Amino acid sequence: MDSFKTLQEHKETIRLFMEYGVPGEFAEPAAALLDKFEADIIGLNLFHNFYSCLPEGTEDAIEKLLLLARKQGVFLLCASSFSGTNYLYLVNNEGAVLLGTLAEGLPDRKLLDFFGFKDNESFLALGKDLSCIEEYEISPADRSLCPACQAAVGEYHILGCPVEICPWCNGQLTRCNCRFTRLDVENFDRESQIEKLQERLDTEGRLPFAKEHSPGYPSDVLSDEGDETGVRRQESGDRSKKNF
């Protein structure tokens, strides 16, 4: 995903894509939905993926977002379009990935295990009646979620999250020197170093997110990092190297 300096810039880019991809009769409700999530990076990331590369290659618009599952700052969302198709997206603070349609299910075994589904059949059963699935609603001021990586209370942060507390000194993990001294390195410029740091953190005992860790305003943390789009997924090293 492209890097955006502000959420407003992110929104305006999406709006530009919408001008070319949204049918006229759906322009108003589609714009209203975008406005609703203008301060929510998860919603904006999904919109950006959808409108920048329309799934079917034809004009369409998102009518509503449904929350299928959420874990450790990763959201499994259904984007119901005005054309009647329900698209399945994997979303976090860094971006969104189209997985297919809800009718196709979630065939990836790792994703099924991650979100706690027994098999694809059990996942498909979830989508049989969309009226029973709650709409995705989130406030950036929700203190039960990490304002930077969206991990819920009791869950581990995405590695590199600026809110995570260091288990060795109780300082801010991305700012204290423990990550360097524990590995006896001066900087992190290789994937193997990031992986080794995670192993050390797991051994020591990472501190899961707690409400008292949350700053007064999400922008306080995000602005310190200079990027309101959040942190990169753990398996991607570029941003991890930047934060570590």
Annotate each language-model stretch with its function.
Residues G226-F244:
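Short, C-terminally biased terminal segments at protein or domain edges
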Residues D2-C132:
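Long, charged N-terminal interaction/targeting segments
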Residues F114-G226:
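Cys/His-clustered metal-coordination modules, chiefly Zn-binding fingers
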